[in-house]
Design a protein with these regions (language model features):
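Short glycine-/aliphatic-rich beta-strand segments at the starts of folded cytosolic domains
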Residues: 140-157, 183-185
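Conserved short beta-strand edge segments in small beta-sheet-based binding/regulatory domains
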Residues: 172-177, 203-220
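Terminal, non-globular segments
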Residues: 185, 191-192
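Short, structured loop/turn "capping" segments at alpha-beta junctions
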Residues: 103-107, 134-146, 159, 174-175
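Short amphipathic alpha-helix segments
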Residues: 152-170
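Short amphipathic alpha-helices in soluble, non-transmembrane regions
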Residues: 162-167, 195-203
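C-terminal regulatory domains involved in ligand/effector binding and gene-expression control
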Residues: 5-87, 210-222
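Active-site beta-strand/loop microenvironment that shapes enzyme catalytic pockets
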Residues: 89-137
Length: 222
C-alpha cells in the first residue's frame, strides 16, 4: 500500500506524559526565571490536560506559553503566547522543536517575571533558549520504519546466521525455536535484498524468507 512507502523516520521524546510530571530545566536571565518542560505527546487533548497541570503547579507564574508538533510527518503544529506579546513566546518555542527535527513533542515554558522587561527580541531569544535546553535534556528516541524479515533455517545453520546478524548490526526480535529456527530481523526496506542475498549465500540456499508489514520501531538515541 501507498502508506507503507511513505513512512519516514522521526525523532521524539521517550515515553508517555508521566503522571508525576517531568523535571523542568531552569534558565535565568535578568532576574526572569524560565522553566522548560518537554514531553512526548501524540494527542492535543492530552497536551492541554498536561498544560493545565503545569499551570496549576505554577499558579503564581504570569505566563506559560507552549508549542507542540504532532504526527509522524510533523503536520500538526500549535503554539500559544499565553499573554506574552504576539510572536515572542509560542513561536520561538515551536521553532526550537522544529530546529531539532522533532515531532510528537510538546514544550511548555513557565516564566516568572523578575521585574526587568526583556523587550520583544529578548523574550524571543529567552524562550527559544529555554525551550532548547528543555528539549536537549530530554531522553529521545528515533522512530524508524523497519520491516520484519522472518528467516527460517535449520539448527545447524544457527551459529553462522547469528554471527552474520551480529557483524551486520541488524536489529532483531524474538527467535522462535520449533522444528526449525525462525529468526526475526528488523530491516530498512532498502536493505532487505542485501541481507537476503548474504543469508542465502551463507546457508547455501537453505534459508526460507517471509516479509512482514513495515512498522515504526523505537531506536534509543544516545
Amino acid at each position: 500500500p501507498q502508506e507503507q512507502m511513505t513512512m519516514e523516520a522521526y525523532t521524539t521524546i521517550t515515553g508517555e506524559i508521566p503522571e508525576g510530571g517531568v523535571s523542568p530545566v531552569l534558565y535565568e536571565i535578568q532576574r526572569s526565571r524560565f522553566l522548560a518542560y518537554a514531553v512526548h505527546a501524540e494527542d492535543e487533548e492530552a497536551v492541554r490536560t498536561w498544560l493545565q497541570g503545569v499551570k496549576k503547579e505554577h499558579y503564581e507564574a504570569r505566563h506559560v506559553p507552549y508549542a507542540m508538533v504532532l504526527g509522524a510527518r510533523s503536520d500538526r503544529q500549535r503554539s500559544s503566547d499565553d499573554g506574552e506579546p504576539g510572536g515572542t513566546a509560542g513561536s520561538p518555542i515551536l521553532e526550537a522543536i522544529k530546529a531539532r527535527n522533532m515531532t510528537n513533542t510538546a514544550v511548555a515554558v513557565v516564566r516568572y517575571f523578575g521585574g526587568i522587561k526583556l523587550g520583544a527580541g529578548g523574550l524571543i531569544r529567552a524562550y527559544a533558549h529555554a525551550a532548547g535546553l528543555g528539549l536537549d535534556a530530554a531522553a529521545k528516541i528515533r522512530m524508524t520504519p523497519l520491516r520484519p524479515l522472518y528467516v527460517q533455517i535449520d539448527y545447524d545453520l544457527l551459529a553462522a546466521a547469528e554471527r552474520y546478524i551480529r557483524e551486520a548490526s541488524v536489529q532483531t526480535e524474538e527467535t522462535s525455536y520449533a522444528d526449525v529456527v525462525t529468526l526475526t530481523l528488523l530491516i530498512p526496506t532498502g536493505d532487505i535484498e542485501l541481507h537476503q542475498r548474504a543469508l542465502t549465500d551463507l546457508t547455501a540456499g537453505r534459508a526460507r524468507y517471509r516479509l512482514g508489514a513495515q512498522r515504526y520501531v523505537a531506536v534509543p538515541l544516545a
